[in-house]
Amino acid sequence: MGESERSEAFNPPREAGMSSGDIAELEQLRREIVVLREQLEHAVGPHGSVRSVRDVHQLEARIDSLTARNSKLMDTLKEARQQLLALREEVDRLGQPPSGYGVLLAAHDDETVDVFTSGRKMRLTCSPNIEVASLRKGQTVRLNEALTVVEAGTFEAVGEVSTLREVLADGHRALVVGHADEERIVCLAEPLVAENLLDGVPGALNDDSRPRKLRPGDSLLVDPKAGYAFERVPKAEVEDLVLEEVPDVSYQDIGGLTRQIEQIRDAVELPFLHKELYREYALRPPKGVLLYGPPGCGKTLIAKAVANSLAKKMAEVRGDDAREAKSYFLNIKGPELLNKFVGETERHIRLIFQRAREKASEGTPVIVFFDEMDSIFRTRGTGVSSDVETTVVPQLLSEIDGVEGLENVIVIGASNREDMIDPAILRPGRLDVKIKIERPDAEAAQDIYSKYLTESLPVHADDLTEFDGDRAACIKAMIEKVVDRMYAEIDDNRFLEVTYANGDKEVMYFKDFNSGAMIQNVVDRAKKNAIKSVLETGQPGLRIQHLLDSIVDEFAENEDLPNTTNPDDWARISGKKGERIVYIRTLVTGKSSSASRAIDTESNLGQYL
């Protein structure tokens, strides 16, 4: 509505008959309306609605900003409050009095415990948070400033190492020996007591995954002040030298030693399998067997087969499953027994026989096998740089036939220099049976070859065709041909010419130095040649020519091996005994004569290897 329209609305025509007084009052009202309208327009303005919305938006934005700042301040205050609480806890923790530790000795029904702490034995109370029934003897416990048990820990992990002499009758104490040979009685922590009680659990000793019973010679972790032994410490010094597992080797795996196998079975198996007959005839079983002969002829292999066969025979006698047959084969690595410290070698020997007696007390046969016996039990007085054999040999003698008898234990020794072993060990009553493992002859060599050349091997088609596809006949012919080639006394097989001290000369062939190890090496070479032939020609199968070529290669590798510096010592190791050898000349085809060497002075035999 315009200004003129508004004026006309409030200005009626004069001819309406209004009085002058009414008109004056109307004008006064009109002026007041105009003043009020001006005031309103001045307060709101012509665009009042738009300005009001803009102000509202600005206010809302400011409110949002203030709200965000307020939230951030609240989060900062919360974080500061948490840090303050953590710092307060840290201050409280740092301000706590120190805690002591002790070893639990015993627990009582009145919720008190005996604890060894600070060199004193004390009876203390326990915190309500501690279950006294769950505490175990030997356990470490934490004490507060009031000497109250507030926490149960683990068992002590550090301390002195002592050797177990024996477990006392109560099963909770043991006699141990310290470093200075001081004997003391200590209590066994509950884990050790539990291990020692496994003797009554069926199959506990046969399960390697479970703890075993304590035995003399074990190393124990001991706290001498508290008087407790906490755990058994593995001993590398003896554990590495002894192999208790029975090797999976049978007499059927050994070729060419039928007579020797029968001898050792008579010496070892008969006394264990027919104890009643031995008692009836008042016959004492042999205590030991010596296997001697040149290297690589099966001494160690026979010893392994003895343990395997004996375990199975004992299982048959007892009616047990032969697959679960159990016996103990203590394989002693001779040279590793030697120790630079005086008395250590003797101590190791004592520990070995202690273990053997313990196993034998269960009624299970135990074989103690000393490989390379000449390295540790030499003739007394022959040492050059030391006289260790003067005490090591008597220690073995006292163990074999000392005051303590060896029941169900037999000692087997192996050596290629039996002349260097002390005679006191070899006398009857100690190593009663002496079996010579000789080099294989042609017949024995065929038997050995048959162990490696079996019908399961792939044979070349051309060789099979010669025998009309008969694989067994082809393998047999291969063995016969390779043995004939190896044992033929032809110029190509000549090896050495030796001159004895009396002037006699003798030509030796490779067959005189053959061994089971050499035969195995020949077969392995032939198999490798067959594989190379497959890769080159694509024709699979083993051929006779592969074996013949392997013999030539094997002989060629051995032509430089004879020791021409000390020929007599070399000959003794190789199995040639008798007249002293002073001169060796190699006769291998193509070998120059410069390889021969004369020995003008006689060497001290048995001194150098």
From Swiss-Prot:
Transmembrane segment boundaries: none
What pathway, per the record?
A: Protein degradation; proteasomal Pup-dependent pathway
Q: Where is this region: Docks into pockets in the proteasome alpha-ring?
A: 608-609
List every stretch annotated Disordered: 1-22
Any one of the GO CC terms: proteasome complex
Q: What is known of its domains?
A: Consists of three main regions, an N-terminal coiled-coil domain that binds to protein Pup and functions as a docking station, an interdomain involved in ARC hexamerization, and a C-terminal ATPase domain of the AAA type.
What is the purpose of this protein? ATPase which is responsible for recognizing, binding, unfolding and translocation of pupylated proteins into the bacterial 20S proteasome core particle. May be essential for opening the gate of the 20S proteasome via an interaction with its C-terminus, thereby allowing substrate entry and access to the site of proteolysis. Thus, the C-termini of the proteasomal ATPase may function like a 'key in a lock' to induce gate opening and therefore regulate proteolysis.
Q: What is this protein called?
A: Proteasome-associated ATPase
Q: Which organism is it from?
A: Mycobacterium leprae (strain TN)
Q: Point out the gene that encodes the protein.
A: mpa
